[in-house]
Amino acid sequence: MKYMIPDEEFIRREGVPITKEEIRAVSIGKLNLNKDDVVVDVGCGSGGMTVEIAKRCKFVYAIDYLDGAIEVTKQNLAKFNIKNCQIIKGRAEDVLDKLEFNKAFIGGTKNIEKIIEILDKKKINHIVANTIVLENAAKIINEFESRGYNVDAVNVFISYAKKIPSGHMFLAKNPITIIKAVR
């Protein structure tokens, strides 16, 4: 098994983001997955994290409210022959209560306080949340800490080398804050 599937192997759709390969690697590491885990992927987007999580655990619930995200996630699950996943169209705060899982990955941060509240009430003790927005990082950290979680946050900067006439230069991508909350 490849450690991480290269970005270019995923089916993409304009306007539906995919978590970059290196960010997926760090996020998967922070999730500390094992074969018995049942994981919810909140804001599944293009399904990059959904596919990578499903390769490493028992089952994944992939949630998104955007039609485009649901469609491209379905395509990526089919492409990589992922069978241990259920895609749910809807808002996480409306469906999380109905699901049984022991870990959560949050890639979409709309209504984050409500999502964390539900995860807390469900006694989910291992959560990883990714955000590109600085204010959301602070909000997520504060929300977890106020609920008694131990929080570990890392800001990851990825740069890719590009050949130029005089050699190579690095082109930076947007930094991502990866927040792990456990108790």
UniProtKB/Swiss-Prot annotation:
Which superkingdom heads the taxonomic lineage of this protein's source? Answer: Archaea
Q: Which cysteines are joined by disulfide bonds?
A: none
GO MF:
cobalt-precorrin-6B C5-methyltransferase activity; protein methyltransferase activity
Carries keyword Transferase? yes
Specify which residues bind S-adenosyl-L-methionine according to the UniProt entry for this protein: 19, 43-47, 64, 92
Q: Which reaction does it catalyse?
A: Co-precorrin-6B + S-adenosyl-L-methionine = Co-precorrin-7 + S-adenosyl-L-homocysteine + CO2
| Annotated EC | 2.1.1.196
Pathway entry: Cofactor biosynthesis; adenosylcobalamin biosynthesis; cob(II)yrinate a,c-diamide from sirohydrochlorin (anaerobic route): step 8/10
Q: What keywords does the record list, in alphabetical order?
A: Cobalamin biosynthesis, Methyltransferase, S-adenosyl-L-methionine, Transferase
InterPro entries on file: CbiT, Cbl_synth_MTase_CbiT, Cobalamin_biosynth_MTase, Methyltranfer_dom, SAM-dependent_MTases_sf
Sections of the chain in a coiled coil: none
Q: Which SUPFAM superfamilies match?
A: S-adenosyl-L-methionine-dependent methyltransferases
Single biological process term from Gene Ontology: methylation
| NCBIfam families from the UniProt entry | CbiT
Q: Which family does it belong to?
A: Belongs to the methyltransferase superfamily. Archaeal-type CbiT family.
Q: What is the designated name of this protein?
A: Probable cobalt-precorrin-6B C(15)-methyltransferase (decarboxylating)
Q: Which gene encodes it?
A: cbiT
